């Protein structure tokens, strides 16, 4: 019988080869999935370690160069340092100088050239450089690209800088700001003068304190300007903030990095390169669950597809935001609204209870000195709106609603003084100028164009004079993260009329002694604790102000009932109710408003909470420094 062999057919060979090929391809893909992230991580770690070493380690002959510069007559400039070495030498000079502020980097400075301060040309400076037992200085870097903008965020910045400097005489504050704020060598003094004038931070006028404030001008501020990026704005601003942060820390490495403006995508870079603790004072979330909720998929097929793409983009961005926030060691928020959103967004590497509210400093003491007698006799029917001229402040809505209110009020009360609206704000750039111009044009079409006025770039004393005689203070921003200006209204004795959202609703214009915020003239007292009542026994419980909605203009609206069960009205309707309060009810509401904010939002209250965070950062800085020394890094 013949032997028969089952030889594989060509089809069988193809099946085997295809199976082997697919298996090999799968193995290669699996290997790539493992190796690419691993190699990327190793490369990133090595790159950050090299940068950290170079930016902190001055050249071997740096002390001789400094001594030579100190001994020279006249202004001496140290040349010959490269980009990396200049940053390390600058850091050592700032830490050892009698006048660290002299080493500020402005728009006209060359980063590779360092001029020796005249105050440092003495024996004391050289002794400090050689004295290993001298108290160690620490640099707290405040990242705030718009340090001279004059808004609520800048008030927080300068109050934090003041409290940080007063915490320890061996602390130096470095302000990382846009170089546009520092066009000349004398610009730092101009910026500090503006902080004293605008925010009444009088401690910053002290010459000795100013010596411990160093300004580091950063390039590329236009990269974080939203108008630079009409498309993919959030993503491109995030990338721009990383570039700005790199430019700042490569000029001067701090020991603690504090972000007071809200650029969290810089945190991973700062942490990798500097190995220092990162703290953040969050004014508002870059992206929030409210933003994600505004995307509607119930549209035409084309628009629905675009909405899906936008939603995917935002969700990926939100995950990246969560990742970036995980590098922050200490998180502070400015309001309940912001705190709730940040606890929701920064869930990774953070316990919710570790994200704490630190209410911003609002200068309540200076404004609460206005006498109570002036609140009843010297107040005119003037409505004030203090806000930067930005689109989200919605000045146009206020103007439109005021016109409706003005027409109704003057027809109903022809013998009463006519109301007046005053816009107060800073003009930062050409865009702000254009918005003011358009508002002036819009005001010409009112029932009475003379019933509206504009006060631009006013110093603190001028603003205080306006608040001294005004009756109502308006805030129209939707989901305002906090609303410092609302606190200022209430401290000065004005009745606040605020949008029914965000910080003004949740934290500021809230029940006093358990009474709901009213939206009518009825003042019904409710029981309150004996301790609170004894502290404010002259002020009866009740509402502290009014809330309003903007139907058709608000992205989302809280349509819940007001205190008296009626729907919350528009701004025009709410202004009418506020102006129709009796004299006694008006006086009581002003008194309640002032007392409710006097302690909660004072500079002293902010300072005490900031000191608590300083103690945490102080310990974290010592731990991180210990890690660097263990690795053999220069420090």
Curated annotation (Swiss-Prot):
One of its GO terms (biological process) is dolichol-linked oligosaccharide biosynthetic process. Keywords: Endoplasmic reticulum, Glycosyltransferase, Membrane, Transferase, Transmembrane, Transmembrane helix. It is a single-pass membrane protein. It is an enzyme of class 2 (transferase). Its main location: endoplasmic reticulum. Its EC number is 2.4.1.131. Pathway: Protein modification; protein glycosylation. Residues 1-21 are lumenal. It catalyses: an alpha-D-Man-(1->3)-[alpha-D-Man-(1->6)]-beta-D-Man-(1->4)-beta-D-GlcNAc-(1->4)-alpha-D-GlcNAc-diphospho-di-trans,poly-cis-dolichol + 2 GDP-alpha-D-mannose = an alpha-D-Man-(1->2)-alpha-D-Man-(1->2)-alpha-D-Man-(1->3)-[alpha-D-Man-(1->6)]-beta-D-Man-(1->4)-beta-D-GlcNAc-(1->4)-alpha-D-GlcNAc-diphospho-di-trans,poly-cis-dolichol + 2 GDP + 2 H(+). Residues 232-252, 482-502 dip into the membrane without crossing it. The chain crosses the membrane at residues 22-42. The keyword Membrane applies. Residues 43-231, 253-481, 503-635 are cytoplasmic. Pfam families: ALG11_N (PF15924), Glycos_transf_1 (PF00534). GO terms for molecular function: GDP-Man:Man3GlcNAc2-PP-Dol alpha-1,2-mannosyltransferase activity. One of its GO terms (cellular component) is endoplasmic reticulum membrane. It comes from the Eukaryota. It is found in: Endoplasmic reticulum membrane. Belongs to the glycosyltransferase group 1 family. GDP-Man:Man(3)GlcNAc(2)-PP-Dol alpha-1,2-mannosyltransferase that operates in the biosynthetic pathway of dolichol-linked oligosaccharides, the glycan precursors employed in protein asparagine (N)-glycosylation. The assembly of dolichol-linked oligosaccharides begins on the cytosolic side of the endoplasmic reticulum membrane and finishes in its lumen. The sequential addition of sugars to dolichol pyrophosphate produces dolichol-linked oligosaccharides containing fourteen sugars, including two GlcNAcs, nine mannoses and three glucoses. This is GDP-Man:Man(3)GlcNAc(2)-PP-Dol alpha-1,2-mannosyltransferase.
């Amino acid at each position: 019988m013949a032997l028969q062999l089952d030889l594989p057919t060509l089809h069988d060979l193809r099946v085997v080869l295809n199976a082997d090929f697919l298996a090999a391809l799968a193995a290669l893909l699996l290997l790539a999935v493992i190796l690419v992230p691993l190699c990327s991580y190793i490369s990133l770690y090595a790159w950050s370690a090299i940068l950290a070493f170079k930016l902190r380690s001055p050249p071997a002959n740096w002390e001789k160069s400094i001594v030579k510069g100190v001994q020279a007559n006249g202004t001496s400039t140290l040349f010959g340092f490269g980009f990396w070495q200049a940053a390390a030498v600058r850091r050592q000079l700032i830490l050892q100088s009698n006048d660290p502020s002299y080493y500020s980097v402005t728009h006209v400075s060359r980063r590779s050239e360092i001029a020796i301060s005249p105050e440092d040309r003495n024996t004391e400076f050289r002794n400090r450089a050689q004295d290993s037992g001298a108290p160690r200085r620490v640099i707290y870097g405040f990242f705030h690209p718009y340090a001279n903008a004059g808004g609520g965020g800048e008030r927080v910045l300068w109050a934090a800088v003041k409290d940080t400097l007063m915490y320890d005489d061996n602390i130096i504050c470095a302000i990382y700001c846009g170089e546009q704020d520092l066009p000349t060598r004398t610009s730092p003094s101009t910026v500090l003068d503006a902080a004293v004038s605008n925010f009444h931070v009088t401690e910053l006028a002290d010459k000795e304190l100013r010596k411990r404030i160093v300004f580091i001008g950063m390039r590329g501020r236009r990269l974080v300007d939203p108008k630079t990026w009409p498309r993919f704005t959030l993503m491109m601003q995030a990338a721009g903030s990383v570039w700005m942060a790199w430019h700042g820390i490569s000029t001067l490495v701090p020991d603690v990095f504090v972000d007071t403006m809200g650029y969290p995508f810089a945190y991973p870079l700062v942490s990798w390169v500097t190995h220092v603790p990162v703290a953040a004072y969050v004014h508002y979330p870059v992206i929030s669950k409210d933003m994600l909720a505004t995307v509607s998929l119930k549209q035409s097929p084309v628009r629905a597809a675009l909405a899906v793409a936008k939603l995917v983009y935002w969700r990926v961005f939100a995950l990246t935001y969560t990742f970036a926030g995980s590098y922050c060691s200490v998180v502070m928020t400015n309001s309940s609204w912001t705190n709730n959103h940040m606890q929701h967004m920064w869930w990774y590497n953070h316990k919710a209870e570790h994200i704490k509210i630190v209410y911003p400093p609002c200068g309540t003491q200076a404004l609460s000195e206005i006498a109570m007698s002036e609140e009843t006799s010297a107040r005119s029917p003037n409505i004030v709106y203090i806000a930067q001229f930005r689109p989200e402040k919605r000045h146009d809505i206020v103007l439109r609603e005021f016109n409706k209110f003005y027409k109704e009020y003057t027809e109903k009360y022809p013998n009463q003084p006519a109301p007046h609206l005053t816009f107060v704000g800073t003009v930062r750039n050409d865009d702000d100028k254009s918005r003011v111009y358009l508002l002036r044009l819009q005001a010409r079409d009112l029932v009475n164009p003379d019933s509206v006025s504009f006060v631009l770039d006013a110093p603190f004393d001028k603003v205080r004079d306006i608040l001294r005689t005004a009756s109502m203070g308006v805030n129209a921003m939707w989901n305002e993260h906090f609303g410092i200006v609302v606190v200022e209204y209430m401290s000065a004795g004005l009745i606040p009329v605020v949008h029914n959202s965000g910080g003004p609703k949740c934290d500021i214009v809230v029940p006093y002694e358990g009474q709901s915020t009213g939206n009518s003239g009825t003042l019904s007292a409710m029981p309150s604790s004996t301790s609170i009542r004894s502290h404010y026994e002259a002020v009866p419980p009740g509402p502290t102000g009014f809330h309003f909605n903007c139907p058709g203009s608000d992205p989302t609206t809280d349509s819940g009932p007001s205190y008296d069960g009626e729907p919350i009205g528009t701004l025009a309707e709410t202004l009418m109710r506020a102006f129709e309060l009796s004299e006694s009810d008006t006086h009581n509401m002003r008194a309640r408003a002032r007392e409710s904010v006097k302690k909660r939002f004072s500079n002293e209250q902010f300072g005490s909470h900031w000191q608590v965070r300083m103690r945490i950062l102080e310990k974290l800085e010592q731990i991180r420094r210990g890690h660097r020394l263990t690795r053999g890094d220069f420090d």
